[in-house]
Swiss-Prot record:
GO cellular component: cytoplasm
Pfam families: PHA_synth_III_E (PF09712)
Organism ancestry: Bacteria, Pseudomonadati, Pseudomonadota, Gammaproteobacteria, Chromatiales
The protein's role, per its UniProt record: Polymerizes D(-)-3-hydroxybutyryl-CoA to create polyhydroxybutyrate (PHB) which consists of thousands of hydroxybutyrate molecules linked end to end. This subunit has no catalytic activity but enhances the activity of PhaC, the catalytic subunit.
Name this protein carries in UniProt: Poly(3-hydroxyalkanoate) polymerase subunit PhaE
Gene: phaE
Compartment annotation: Cytoplasm
Keywords for the protein's UniProt record, in alphabetical order: Cytoplasm, PHB biosynthesis
Pathway(s) annotated for this protein in UniProt: Biopolymer metabolism; poly-(R)-3-hydroxybutanoate biosynthesis
Family: Belongs to the PHA/PHB synthase family. Type III PhaE subfamily.
């Protein structure tokens, strides 16, 4: 009889492979098979801490904390990258190593390295917030959930759909087909403007790397040294902020941002028209009808105020003709009040008349 228990090492190894296979299948289903692995112990510890604390984090602050965690991971990743110095620590090889590290960062910004397409998202964490805010705003104003145009291949779609959009509509739904064609053209224009806007931020990343290279070259030429990873990270942040402040103030950024806003408003207007068409087909009140009703109610309020002012002016004129002030004219008793005073006088007379016989009887 074998002395091995049922839960031997082979069984545990089989269970581990089973769960690893399920985890790998889940990552592939979610598109996370090429996600970057955690290379540093501090980065792994920070990730485990956030996974334990994130379920209890409120929704309104979870996004902010995720950005902070990503900044911390970038800090540890950069510290690990620059801490792995070459074996030959001469000045020439050291400068070559620093130059190669900066060139790799530029390649990551340009997307030339095979990193699953996530290098740009990680390296753009410093400028990801404005783009993320814009995408959230666009998603909230769109009748369709999510950002449907985020991963759309613009050039391929533009080339293939150009012929289809140029074809006229057929049948009794040709007007509706024409509206959908216009909606598609507007969406493609917005996608082109969004890609131009994102490309501008990619150029910011490359210029920041160049500025960081100039800073490191200046440190090497001066004979100084960088004492800690925190100093290196602070200088990197300073380079990014300087480049951002300089480039955002240029007319080029104003034109790019203006084209993006115009394309977004045109797309929003076209979507609103399509929504009104669908609501009208279902015999439901549309947005334009509700807005027309609101305008008419506002006009009615204005007319009532004008009539009230005109009536008050007429009351003043009547009071001036009758020789009374407007206040007394408004508070003057109506003619029906005099009629009500007469019964009171009669009642007093009757009381006096009724009191006289009583007194005569007492004298008798």
């Amino acid at each position: 009889m074998s002395n091995d228990s049922f839960f031997n090492n082979d069984w545990l190894e089989l269970q581990r492979k089973y769960w690893d296979s399920w985890s790998e299948m889940g990552r592939k289903a979610m598109g996370l098979e090429n996600q970057q692995t955690l290379t540093t112990p501090w980065e792994g510890a920070l990730d485990h801490w956030w996974k334990a604390m994130s379920p209890a984090t409120p929704d309104f602050s979870k996004t902010f904390m995720e950005k902070m965690m990503e900044q911390g991971k970038n800090f540890f990743r950069m510290a690990e990258t620059f801490a792995n110095t070459p074996e030959d620590t001469t000045a020439t090889n050291g400068l070559t190593w620093w130059t190669k590290a900066l060139e790799d960062m530029q390649k990551q910004f340009s997307g030339s390295l095979d990193d699953g397409g996530n290098s740009m998202q990680r390296m753009m964490s410093f400028w990801e917030l404005p783009i993320d805010n814009w995408q959230r705003m666009m998603s909230s104003m769109s009748p369709m959930p999510g950002d449907m145009l985020r991963n759309m291949p613009h050039e391929q779609l533009k080339d293939r759909s150009g012929r289809a959009l140029s074809a006229p509509g057929l049948g009794y739904t040709r007007e509706e087909q024409s509206q959908y064609h216009q909606l598609t053209r507007t969406a493609m224009d917005y996608q082109a403007a969004l890609q131009e806007y994102t490309g501008f931020y990619s150029q910011l990343g490359m210029k920041s790397v160049e500025r960081m290279g100039d800073f490191i070259q200046g440190v090497i030429d001066s004979g100084k040294s960088i004492d800690s990873a925190r100093t290196l990270y602070d200088n990197w942040i300073s380079c990014c902020e300087t480049v951002y402040a300089a480039e955002v103030a240029t007319p080029e950024y104003a034109q790019i941002h203006g084209r993006l806003v115009n394309a977004q408003m045109a797309l929003k207007r076209r979507m609103a028209i399509m929504v009104d068409e669908n609501l009208g087909a279902m015999n439901m009140p549309t947005r334009s009808e509700l807005r027309t009703l609101q305008d008419r109610l506002q006009e009615t309020r204005r007319d009532n105020k004008q009539l009230h002012r005109a009536l008050h002016a007429l009351e003043k004129q009547v009071a001036a003709l009758s020789g009374k002030t407007p206040t007394t004219a408004l508070k003057a008793p109506a003619p029906a009040t005099k009629a009500t005073e007469k019964p009171a006088t009669r009642a007093t007379t009757r009381r006096k008349t009724a009191a006289k016989p009583t007194g005569g009887t007492a004298d008798d």
